Amino acid sequence: MSSQPPRVRSRRSERNQTAERPLEDDIDTSRRGMGPGVRPVVAVTGAASGIGHRVALLLSENEQVKRLIAIDERRGDIPGAQWRIMDVRDPALAGRLDGVDVVLHLDLDLSLDSEPRARGARNVRGTQTVLTAAAAAGVPRVVLCTSAMVYGALPENETPLDEDAPLKATADASLVGDLLEIEELAARAPRAHRALNVTVVRPATLVGGPEADSVLTRHFEAPRLLVVSGSRPRWQFCHVDDLASALVYAALGKVEGVVTVASEGWLEQEEVEELSGMRRMELPASLALGTAERLHRLGLTPAPAGDLAYTMHGWVVPSTRLRDAGWRPLWTNELAFAALLEDVAGRHALVARRLGRKDATTLGAAGATVALIGTAAIVRKVRKRRGI
């Protein structure tokens, strides 16, 4: 790694010590007729683990929260929380939200290892149930969390994107399809339930914990960094700690509508290579995309070819509404990327498929280029076995 931090092509964080918390008097209470200083009752789904647990812990320590309702299928360790042990897809959820002012729905299955159809059905059904239950219980506000990936990664993307830019992602790109359906539900809910306000938080590439495992973090588990010829990647990260603090802002009504969250600025591909010490492997688009598509179609990798676009083109977001509300990220892109490298150390993946130790040793010796091109042999072998 370079001893000097690389130049970032955007403004740095203006403050990197602590994220500001919204003042109680600043909380928007107009939608539920509450006067200034009235503390909300907050419910968090998925509170037993992952980002839901991180957010619930922050809310349990926040004096601006009157009461915390933790919802999950099992109990977690959150001081002072009142637990509701249930599946968020259960229609009985409406009866467990009495007196709640805001619901943070964070109970999503984002695992690359889950069966795609079952995962999608769970995520969409869970979100539908939460929105319907909140409206039925008279909850004024719901906060959802998707991803900035819903904007799509296109060569014509502006840098940074406008928070209100249209969603151009393709629905077949792994988890993005689930997130696009959730976005559609978020857009429809206030029209169907006029008293319901829905906030959607869209983080950049998550790093900083097991809940951040994704196609994009596994990109850095490969023996070399795949670069598609002619592309210009721009890397932007969001540490889970920054996402958690942003979700607290949303819970307290400090931000509404569409909210993006990320470290300030971005890193160019050359900076990522310098910081990581990894060498690039540059391949023509036809070879890289064709190989990824064949491997996915045969069930050998969890990532369809469409996901490679997120490593080819920029999809940088500005965190405008959060910044206007006084929020600042604690993590720069350089620090967040360092956390990512620490998390993936010792892991090995190729086209988002996790490899065993023996496979990784072979790849390290043969080189990633040979491995990728050699997937043609894997394809032929699988086809022969299946009689294709």
PLM features: residue spans?
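NAD(P)H-binding glycine-rich loop region in Rossmannoid oxidoreductase-like domains
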Residues: 85-128, 133, 137, 153
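Conserved C-terminal active-site "lid" loop/helix of NAD(P)H-dependent oxidoreductases
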Residues: 240, 270-271, 299-328
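Mid/C-terminal beta-alpha module of Rossmann-like enzyme folds, strongest
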Residues: 246-305, 347-355, 380-387
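Amphipathic terminal alpha-helices
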Residues: 333-388
